[in-house]
């Protein structure tokens, strides 16, 4: 099956990761997934939240969208004096996913904050934030090693994320907005380089779905995540 943009049903959009996109954070990248563009920045603090065990570090994330990242302008969360439920859900997902990449004891008593700013949204912003956020995180950890604060990187796994869905009864990988907005089933899948699942979110938007359909969507996501892993490694110069 050929889609509106010419892709096969199991094909990712064109993916590009530009590292060191801004100069002040310890790690940064711009990830482009088709027309979705997310700026990911990693900042290091020499302290941890109160709930973190002594001798361990922490990784957390924040997610937001530029007011005109979509077709119509939306108000910033700060203008509403509270974080939107959607933003809160997404940044928790990104934070959980990236914590799975790190040995917190090896990181030591410091926090790495991952800020994900959607510059343009055309579907898949949360999974793009995971994939790009990991690259920014890895660059920040590399800087800790290069500057002598750590003997080796605390990164233990690569982490990527991608979406899949059922549109017009056809399972598809990496939905753009025109597909996502009419999907009968929507699924987000975060995996490590071993093919293990870190996060799986599946929703019946227009109808319920079967276990066989879920397995097919996960299979598509596994294929997409393997391809994203190669792109991450290329962006990082083949090493952590």
List each model region and its residues.
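Short, Gly/Pro- and small/polar-rich lid/capping loops
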Residues: 1-32
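Glycine-rich, charged/polar anion/phosphate-binding loops
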Residues: 15-18, 24-27, 45-47, 99-101, ...
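Structured core elements
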Residues: 16-18, 30-32, 39-41, 60-62, ...
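Glycine-rich, flexible beta-strand/loop modules in the N-terminal catalytic cores of phosphate-handling
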Residues: 21, 29-107, 197-219
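Conserved phosphate/anionic-ligand binding catalytic regions in large, soluble enzymes, centered on
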Residues: 29-31, 125-132
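A structural signal for small-residue-enriched, beta-sheet-centric alpha/beta enzyme cores
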Residues: 85, 106-109, 124-128, 138-142, ...
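Buried hydrophobic packing segments
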Residues: 94, 98, 132-141
């Amino acid at each position: 099956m050929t889609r509106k943009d010419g892709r096969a049903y199991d094909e990712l959009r064109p993916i590009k990761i530009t590292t060191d996109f801004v100069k002040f954070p310890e790690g940064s990248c711009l990830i482009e997934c088709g027309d979705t563009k997310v700026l990911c920045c990693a900042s290091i603090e020499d302290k941890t939240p109160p709930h973190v065990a002594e001798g361990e570090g922490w990784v957390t994330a924040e997610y937001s969208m530029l007011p005109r990242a979509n077709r119509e302008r939306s108000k910033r969360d700060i203008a509403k004096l509270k974080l939107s439920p959607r933003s809160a859900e997404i940044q928790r997902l990104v934070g959980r996913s990236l914590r799975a990449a790190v040995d917190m004891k090896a990181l030591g008593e410091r926090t790495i904050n991952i800020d994900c700013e959607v510059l343009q949204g055309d579907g898949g912003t949360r999974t793009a934030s995971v994939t790009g956020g990991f690259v920014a995180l890895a660059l920040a950890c590399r800087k800790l090693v290069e500057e002598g604060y750590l003997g080796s990187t605390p990164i233990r796994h690569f982490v990527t994320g991608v979406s899949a869905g059922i549109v017009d009864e056809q399972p598809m990988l990496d939905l753009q907005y025109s597909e996502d907005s009419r999907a009968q089933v929507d699924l987000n899948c975060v995996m490590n380089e071993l093919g293990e699942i870190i996060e799986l979110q599946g929703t019946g938007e227009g109808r319920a779905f079967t276990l066989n359909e879920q397995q097919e969507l996960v299979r598509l996501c596994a294929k997409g995540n393997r391809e994203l892993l190669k792109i991450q490694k290329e962006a990082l110069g083949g090493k952590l």
